[in-house]
Amino acid sequence: MIDSEIRAVFFDAVGTLLFPRTPVSRTYAEHGSRHGSNVTEDQVQLAFREAFARQEVADEAAGWRTDEARERARWRAIVADALPGANSDACFPGLWEWFSTPAAWVVPSDVRLVLRSLADRGLVVGVASNFDSRLFRLVDSFPELAPVRGRCVISSLVGWRKPARQFFDALVEAAGCERGRVLYVGDDVRNDLHGATAAGLRAVLLDPAAETLGPNRIRRLRDLIAG
C-alpha cells in the first residue's frame, strides 16, 4: 500500500499505536469514587466527551499553541468537568500519573509487525502525537515501539497541537525528507487526515469501522504493509 515515493512513516499515538487497557470512563469513575465523586461510568463517558470538546475549542481559539503547562492544565480541567463532586486536587495527580505508566495502555499485536516491516524496508519511522512528555516513558516501556524511539514529535514540546501546520512542519524536520514523501497515519479525521494533507504530507486514516476503503483509509494497521 505504501508506494515507492514514501521515505518516512509517522504514526499518531493514542488510537493508533496505543490504546487504554480499560475504558477511560471506567478508570475515571473508579478514581473519582475515591475522592468524593459518585457518577456512573456512563455519566463520566458523556461528561468526558463534552469536556474534551470544550478544551479543543479553547485550543483552536488559541491557534493550537501549547506547552507542557497547557497540557497539564487542559487535563486538569477535563478531570474536574468529568468528575463533579470529586476533590480534583487529590484526584487529578493520580490520574495523570496512571496514564504515564505502561500498565494503563496496551499495544495491538500488529504494531510490532508493521513497525519492524517498515524499518526493514529502510523507511524512517516515528510517532507524532498530541501528547506531553509522558509519551517518552510509554514509548520506552513497550518493546513493540522500539523502532520509533528517538523520533517522537510531541505537541507540548514543539509548541503546537495538531492540526496546526507548525506541528507537521516539526514532523517533517524529524523525518529528514521532503514533506511529500512523508506518510502520516492516524485515527482522527480532522487532526490526522486533514491536518497532514493540508500541510502537504501524505496521510492514511485508520478507521476500523470503515464501510468502504481506499488509498487513504484502512481498517487495520497491517493493511499498510499488504500487497
Write out the residue ranges for each language-model feature.
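Asp-based, Mg2+/Mn2+-dependent phosphohydrolase catalytic module
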Residues: 1-9, 19, 88-92, 106, ...
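N-terminal helical cap/lid subdomain that shapes the substrate entry/recognition surface
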Residues: 2-113, 121
